[in-house]
Regions:
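Short amphipathic alpha-helix that is part of the acyltransferase structural core
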Residues: 1-31, 126, 135-164
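Conserved donor-binding loop and adjoining core beta-sheet/short helix segment
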Residues: 29-87, 189-209
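Conserved beta-strand-loop-alpha-helix junction that forms the acyl-donor binding cleft
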Residues: 101-112, 234-246, 263-267
């Protein structure tokens, strides 16, 4: 039975068991265990436990946004097909028609198989990369923080088919910085990146095709890392995207072994 909880005090043994198993540990927990432990303090996040025969077999943190009909599984800790089935039954009973996103451990066959049975759409496996310091390499390019004069050019260039559209980013500048690449008074690229957390991440990095491979991607990222101060920065890159991985490495990111993930989405 799935039920919402307000404390994890009784579940540390279960959490440690799941998170010590490389086949089932949740990627978001590995990135930052406060994705689990601070969930109770975060708006619109809910923590559920599944109990089977008196034993805990699943803990799930869900971000639920009713006005947008959107759910994200922030953390999912379970080895049990039964627990995942209970989770999906709960979602189907209460949130029919919602979009639900998952970031899963590629080795978690139990969850992956259930998502396949739900006709989930999967993206490619992602490589985790972390930056703690910017590259020492200098990029003599014009990189600026967003200002209103670039609003329309930024909106026009921005990727449209994502949750964090240009308009949403600009309405959340308490957590996002927007860096702009300028060439001869024209916008040629941008980077959306969070800055309000101990571990921040780029959300969208775009450089116009004719300006790619000139260092703009690295310059945008390097500037963001520099302004990130003592915080770390993480990103996920397609494991087969060797050129993209190289760009991030040149900007100051390191490949982190053993922490890959896969994004999946369903309509409930």
């Amino acid at each position: 039975m799935l039920e919402e909880i307000t404390s994890l005090d009784s579940y540390e043994a279960f959490i440690n068991e799941i998170c010590s198993d490389e086949n089932y540990v949740d990627p978001h927990y590995l990135y930052e265990n406060n994705n689990l432990y601070c969930a109770f303090e975060r708006r619109d996040q809910h923590v559920y436990v599944n109990i089977d025969g008196g034993n805990t077999d699943g803990i799930f943190v869900l971000l639920i946004l009713p006005t947008e009909k959107y759910i994200e599984m922030i953390v999912g800790l379970s080895k049990s097909k039964h627990a995942y089935n209970e989770l999906f039954q709960y979602l189907e009973n209460n949130y029919k028609g919602y979009r639900c996103d998952f970031v899963i451990n590629p080795k978690n066959v139990s969850l992956k198989n259930i998502l396949i049975s739900k006709d989930a759409k999967f993206e490619s496996e992602q490589q985790l990369m972390i930056a703690r310091f910017p590259s020492h390499k200098q990029y003599p390019l014009d990189i600026q923080l967003y200002t209103e004069q670039w609003k329309q050019a930024y909106i026009d260039m921005h990727v449209k088919e994502i949750y964090w559209t240009a308009e949403k980013v600009l309405s959340a500048l308490d957590r996002f910085r927007v860096f702009l690449a300028i060439h001869q008074e024209q916008l040629v690229g941008y980077l959306d990146v969070t800055y309000a957390y101990k571990q921040n991440e780029p959300y969208s990095l775009i450089v116009l095709p004719e300006y790619q491979n000139l260092g703009y991607e690295q310059a945008l990222l390097s500037k963001a890392i520099q302004m990130n101060g003592t915080n770390t920065m993480m990103t996920l890159v397609d494991v087969n995207a060797k050129e993209e991985i190289k760009i991030y490495e040149e900007a100051g990111f390191d490949v982190i072994k053993g922490q890959n993930s896969i994004f999946a989405t369903i309509t409930i």
